[in-house]
Amino acid sequence: MKSYGGLFERILDPANLDAALERAARGKRERAPVQRLLAERATALPRLREELAAGTYRPRPYEQFSICDPKPRRISCAHFRDRVVHHAVCAVLAPLIERRLIADNYACREGKGSHRALLRAQGFARRHGWYLKTDIRRYYDSIDHVILLAKLYALCREPALRRLLAVIVEHPIPGKGLPIGNLTSQWFANLYLDEVDHWVREVERIPGYVRYMDDLALWAHDKERLFALAADLRALLAARLALELKEERTLIAPVGEGMPFLGWRVYPGLLRQQGPRLRRQRRLLVRREAQYLAGEIGADKLQDCVRALAGPRKFLGYGEPLRSTIDV
């Protein structure tokens, strides 16, 4: 992996910090901490820059809350000032990480996303007889900091930047785990499994492969090849990344049975939304309709909800055979 210099200076550039503030504030300008930092940006950003340059910057405590989407998740929300730092760091590091990633890694990347991952998966299902679908047990919570920092340090050679990355990674709990919700966590988690992507493509020579963060799907012409790959993948994850597969979610089956992937079931000629996702969407629409009838939201908000729910169906040709616009 190529190592780069001059990155810390680019992160501290006043223009980069100012742009990071604007990106972090997008869609959140009505919140008090955001308004406060925007109002004080003339003094707050230079002060933040001084802390970063001196190595005295320390993140503030996280605000934590739980969601169920559909399974329970603990979300850690960084202080707005720290989110500005995350955006400033990612503006410089993300393009370097991006160069490492294979084309069929679809999470948290511009021009990718879950819909394109589904279409790509369907393209592979049309050309192979069997699939292997699996994911990582407690992925974000299991990311080893020593292993992750070694991967990040391979990108940058400046001690000051390495110290800043260690501060971000080790907060709030040192040793293991990344908080779900941070922009840095998304990019770092994507990089962490990049070794697996290159192993699948360059060592095992498997062309039929799609990853969406910790959801992995592989295709082959015979199930014996996939059983062997699953065993090798378990060994690689344990030895190199201190991770393990969810055995109860590891499936090897004919493509004609449909592969569960990202809330959908992928068939060679059809994409079908799975029950839990569909029920969540219906409940959301019922809530929005009730809010509209009660006068709590306007017609524009209700229409936004309807468009958001209908968008994936239109893009994916939900419920009918697809004529894919993606080159597979």
Q: What are these model-derived regions, one by one?
A:
Residues M1-R10, A235, L322-V328:
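Intrinsically disordered, low-complexity and often Lys/Arg-enriched segments
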Residues M1-R157, P172:
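Conserved two-metal-ion catalytic palm core of "right-hand" nucleic acid polymerases
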Residues V34, P179, L183, R265:
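Gly/Ser/Thr-rich beta-alpha loop segments that engage phosphate groups in nucleotides
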Residues A78, H87, E224-A228, L245-V328:
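Right-hand nucleic-acid polymerase module
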Residues F80-V84, T184, F188, E257:
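A generic structural signal for residues located within well-ordered alpha-helices
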Residues A88-V92, A230-L233, L237:
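PAPS/PAP-binding and catalytic site of the sulfotransferase fold
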